[in-house]
């Protein structure tokens, strides 16, 4: 059984015996326990289990104790460390020198013992050795007997832990390409060096004929298929057929295609993670899957010109339920856009919520909207907005039909209930695919995302000579008047899922205007997640040594390793590039 990645907590202490160390043992170990309790009571793994922490077997005052801690952590699948101390310790003697995992240090802000002095000293050692570490120091002085973790310290500890866990969850997993390059899209030209060196992942690939092989040879669970077909007939609404008359398929052919796309979903899932039922059916090799944390399906054009498209498969893999009930989503990229798949993966591992995959299709200016509809934009839409619309698939959680405190949300599967599942299905239909684009047919996904949801749009790009670069845009979904929505939506494909998005503007750089956001976006796709998580993404990017070329996150929320400040404190964007370039990828 594969262990969850864990956070290692290292209580460091002044090594002087005969009074000094003894007086600090309880306080120091209590700091470690309080950090472990904070993380385990607040954060969850993608499967819903509480995050696990491992505390060093003793406080660490000298090198042998640091070594003992290191050995324990190696056996315990520790993916990151947090060192805590209320006092002076011996910097390079007590530090964790693992170069391939993130490190953070919390130095207690008190007056009796110099925790801040140790923090500064050990961070200097980390900087000299080229092993980045995050420094955490509370704003306000605390009493020596105060066991509470201040709110500003909590925020940094949790931000660090979320990002560090993401690095651990990615390590030693795989990206699975189903097919190859779709329509010349750069993101589907999969770069194995990027996955290996930056994420610690491997790449696997299967030809799309694997789907037809498994269908023809019955390499799927026939009992599940019958159950799935019954559920789809009862719960999934076939939408209006927008095709011109000569392209409309017969009822008999549409029914056959429903069976086909259900099998596509089952096979796509089994390819990613395996299925023990296949071994019972005599297919032991296929039963193990590909250990894929994220995958993509080429589809266009070789598959979709002949077979039903992948929209149903992609939609339900990214959705948190199917005929087997509520479950965690799979991260799955349209058109095998591996870079958008990784963007979705970053978002998912930080939030445990499903992701919207979308084309960044159109910038609508206030003037253009008024010209086309006669409507004057107001509120969050006043400066214009972006039309996010994928060519036929999207997680049903993207409807915004789940709620929290009466507001639309996208939330982890363990918070979802059956009434929210039904609301998503009721507010979605599946029209026959546009056969001018998808000659083989299939069924697309059509819904409108509810407005007023805080969301973050993300994209990872590869820049020749630099490597991966991340861009982040926080903003809100919009709810337009119904007639305005229909007028604008019908100018594209009315059978596809739509999200209206207004990025938060800052008045400078790429966020001077909504047009500038669109104009600076690095690719045709974006990954959209619930919540404003830009600060967490920046922290994660720094751990992976991926520079961020545009974002609208407030400066006070940016949390990177301490040595980033030695690359410059005025132009943080340039300093980020220099730090990432000098340090190189995390797993190289």
UniProtKB/Swiss-Prot annotation:
Where it sits in the cell: the answer is: Cytoplasm
Cross-referenced CDD domains? L-fucose_isomerase
An example Gene Ontology CC term for this record: cytoplasm
Q: Which residues form the active site?
A: 335, 359
- Please tell me where this protein is predominantly located: cytoplasm
Q: Which cofactor does it need?
A: Mn(2+)
Keywords assigned by UniProt, alphabetized: Carbohydrate metabolism, Cytoplasm, Fucose metabolism, Isomerase, Manganese, Metal-binding
The enzyme class is: isomerase
Q: Which residues bind Mn(2+)?
A: 335, 359, 525
Which InterPro entries did the record assign? Fuc/Ara_isomerase_C, Fuc_iso_dom3_sf, Fuc_isomerase_C, Fucose_iso_dom1_sf, Fucose_iso_N1, Fucose_isomerase, Fucose_isomerase_dom2_sf, Fucose_isomerase_N/cen_sf
Pathway the protein acts in: Carbohydrate degradation; L-fucose degradation; L-lactaldehyde and glycerone phosphate from L-fucose: step 1/3
User: What catalytic reaction does the record list?
Assistant: L-fucose = L-fuculose
For whether the record's keyword set contains RNA-binding, the answer is no
Q: What is its EC number?
A: 5.3.1.25
Q: List the disulfide bonds.
A: none
Pfam family name, one = Fucose_iso_N1
In its UniProt record, which GO terms are filed under biological process?
D-arabinose catabolic process; L-fucose catabolic process
GO MF term list: arabinose isomerase activity; L-fucose isomerase activity; manganese ion binding
Keyword presence, Cytoplasm: yes
**Which NCBIfam families does the UniProt entry name for this protein?**
fucI, PRK10991.1
Task: Name the protein family.
Answer: Belongs to the L-fucose isomerase family.
Known function: Converts the aldose L-fucose into the corresponding ketose L-fuculose.
Query: Know the name of this protein?
Result: L-fucose isomerase
Tell me which species this is from: Streptococcus pneumoniae (strain P1031)
């Amino acid at each position: 059984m594969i262990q969850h990645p864990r956070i290692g907590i290292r209580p460091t202490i002044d090594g002087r015996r005969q009074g000094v160390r003894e007086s600090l043992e309880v306080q120091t170990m209590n700091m470690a326990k309080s950090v472990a309790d904070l993380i385990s009571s607040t954060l969850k793994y993608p499967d819903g289990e509480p995050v696990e922490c491992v505390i060093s077997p003793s406080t660490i005052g000298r090198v042998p104790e640091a070594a003992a801690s290191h050995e324990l952590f190696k056996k315990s699948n520790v993916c990151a460390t947090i060192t805590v101390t209320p006092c002076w310790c011996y910097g390079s003697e007590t530090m964790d020198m693992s170069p391939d995992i993130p490190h953070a240090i919390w130095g207690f802000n008190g007056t009796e013992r110099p925790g801040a002095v140790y923090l500064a000293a050990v961070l200097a050692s980390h900087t000299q050795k080229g092993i980045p570490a995050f420094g955490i120091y509370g704003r306000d002085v605390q009493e020596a007997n105060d066991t509470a973790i201040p709110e500003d310290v909590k925020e940094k500890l949790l931000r660090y832990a979320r990002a560090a866990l993401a690095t651990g969850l990615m390590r030693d997993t795989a990206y699975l390409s189903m097919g190859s390059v779709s329509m010349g899209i750069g993101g589907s030209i999969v770069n194995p060096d990027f996955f290996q060196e930056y994420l610690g992942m491997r790449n696997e690939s299967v030809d799309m004929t694997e789907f037809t092989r498994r269908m023809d040879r019955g390499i799927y669970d026939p009992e599940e298929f019958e159950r799935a077909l019954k559920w789809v007939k009862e719960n999934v609404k076939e939408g209006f057929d927008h095709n011109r008359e000569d392209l409309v398929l017969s009822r008999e052919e549409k029914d056959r295609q429903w069976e086909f796309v259900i099998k596509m979903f089952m096979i796509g899932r089994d390819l990613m993670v395996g299925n023990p039922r296949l071994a019972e059916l005599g297919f032991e090799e296929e039963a193990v899957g590909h250990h894929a944390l994220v995958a993509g399906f080429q589809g266009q054009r070789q598959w979709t010109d002949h077979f039903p498209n992948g929209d149903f498969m992609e939609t339900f893999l990214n959705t948190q339920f199917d005929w087997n009930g509520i479950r965690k989503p799979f991260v799955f990229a349209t058109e095998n856009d591996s870079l958008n798949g990784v963007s979705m993966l970053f978002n998912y591992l930080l939030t445990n919520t499903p992701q919207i995959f979308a084309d960044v299709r159109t910038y609508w200016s206030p003037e253009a909207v008024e010209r086309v509809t006669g409507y004057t934009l107001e509120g969050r839409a006043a400066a214009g907005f972006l039309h996010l619309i994928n060519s036929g698939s999207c997680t049903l959680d993207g409807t915004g039909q789940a709620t929290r405190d009466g507001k639309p949300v996208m939330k982890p599967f363990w918070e979802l209930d059956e009434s929210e599942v039904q609301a998503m299905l009721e507010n979605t239909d599946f029209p026959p695919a546009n056969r001018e684009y998808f000659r083989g047919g299939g069924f697309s996904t059509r819904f409108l995302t509810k407005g007023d949801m805080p969301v973050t749009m993300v994209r990872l790009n590869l820049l020749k000579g630099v490597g991966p670069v991340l861009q982040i845009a926080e903003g809100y979904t919009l709810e337009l008047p119904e007639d305005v929505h229909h007028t604008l939506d019908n100018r594209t494909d009315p059978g596809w899922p739509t999200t209206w998005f207004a990025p938060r503007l800052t008045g400078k750089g790429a966020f001077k205007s909504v047009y500038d956001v669109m104009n600076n976006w690095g690719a045709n796709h974006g990954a959209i997640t619930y919540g404003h998580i830009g600060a967490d993404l920046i922290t994660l990017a720094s751990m992976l040594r991926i520079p961020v070329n545009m974002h609208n996150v407030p400066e006070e929320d940016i949390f990177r390793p301490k040595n980033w400040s030695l690359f410059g404190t005025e132009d943080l964007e340039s300093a980020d590039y220099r730090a990432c370039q000098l340090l190189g990828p995390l797993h190289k």
